[in-house]
Amino acid sequence: NDFAAALRGYEGIPASAFDADKRGDLLFRRAFCRLNTKDYDGAAAELRQLRADSQYSEHSAYYLAYVDYARGDYDSAEQAFSAIRKNSRFWGEAQFYLCQIDFKKEKYSDVVSAGKDLLDKKLPVEMATELNRMLGESQYHLGNSAEAIGYLTDYVNAVDAPERSALFALGVCEFRKGDYENAKTYVGAVTDADDVMAQSAYLFMGQMYLKDDNLNAAALAFEKAYKMPYDESTRETAFYNYALAQSRGGRTPFSSSVKLFQDFLNKFPNSRYASNVEDYIINSYMTSKDYDNALLCIEALKSPSAKMMKAKQNVLY
């Protein structure tokens, strides 16, 4: 619909040309066009004039609440939507936006509690579809993978371009269930950007390739996750797994493999993986009796641990 063109037409009609009933109709049509062209100030001004209009008072209350929501004033919107009575024609839609507000505020338990009942109500198709997404993502955040999969699958199947957050959540839930093929499809779909979600997606892709024993693909995915600067914890885990995949692949020379672990310790000296990495380095050199390079490796560390210093003493004496 061309709301801008319709608005120009309505603006050319003087309100004084109509009686009270028709004037209210004109004001509402103007306000509705303004809402759809994102002229929220103009829409609110006309909607406020309809508060006392018996034909449009419910419309006024609902759409004024929507104006607050569209502006991002969620506290005011929540108060206004909550004030809409249950016998109003807009009650279901108001409850939908209350769920949206809870979702934006990360009140996932509240979304699930209210959303399940609301899904049984007669909502516009677009709202019901979006409600499935919110319920699915909320269940994902609450750790309820089985419930999340049902809602998110319904959502993804109903839209042409699913939200990346929904695809990622569905992929992670499928991963937790052990359905790695579906997980790859959904998680892989969000690696088309350069952001924190894509970084996490590459980490999951690497883990799934490890399950398939596809070490080269795993290493590539881990490397991409590590090189993205967004989340340091993800970078740490990705670098550790990248080094592991390279060391297990058999195609990386021993010296290069150890160098990767050495770089890891220099970048993440306090890592939860540090002890495992130190064991790998120490055992590798001791097994090969390459004591000179063992010393060089330990001395190259910026902050060698007590374990590494003990290994150094063993080499020296």
Which residues make up each language-model segment?
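Acidic, polar-rich low-complexity tracts and alpha-helical solenoid repeat scaffolds
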Residues: 1-317
